[in-house]
Amino acid sequence: SSIIKPWVARLRPTYDPELMFQIRHISGRAGQYGFVSSHAANTFAVATFMSLVFKHRLTTICLLVWASVIGYSRIYLGVHFPLDVLCGAMLGVLVGAFVYMLQHFVHAKFAFSHQQSFSSAYTRSGFLRDDMYIVLTALALTLVYTLV
C-alpha cells in the first residue's frame, strides 16, 4: 500500500479541505494520503493466511472479526474513508492468499515427507489445538483492547 498511496494521491479525511474541520481525530494525522489502508491490508492478509493455514471455523471467524474491527477503527478515527479500508481489505485478502499458495508450494517442494499422527490434539490441518487456543486468546485480547 505504500506504493499505491502516492500513486493514487487520495487525501485522508483529516487532510480533505471539505472535511478536515468536521472530523475530530484522536491522534496525529498520519501521512497525507490514505488510499489504500495499510492497517486493513495487513490485518486482512494475516487473517486470510492464518485462516487458510489453520482451516478452523472458529479461528477464521475470530480472525475476520479482528481484521474488521481494525478496519472500522481506521474509519472511526477519521484517518480513512470506507473505500480506503475496503480496498485495503481486498488487497490484504489477495496478498494473504498468494503468500499461502507460495508457502504451500515451497513446503510441498522442499519439505521432508513425514507422517504425523493425528489425534484429538491436532486440527484437520495438523496444528496443535493448544497453538490454536493461543492464537484465539491473543486475538480476543487484542479485540478487547481495541474496543476499550
Locate each region found by the language model:
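Hydrophobic, glycine- and aromatic-enriched re-entrant/interface helices and adjoining loop segments
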Residues: 15-16, 28
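Alpha-helical transmembrane-segment detector that highlights a single hydrophobic TM helix
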Residues: 17-23
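Transmembrane alpha-helix/helix-exit interface in multi-pass inner-membrane proteins
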Residues: 1-14
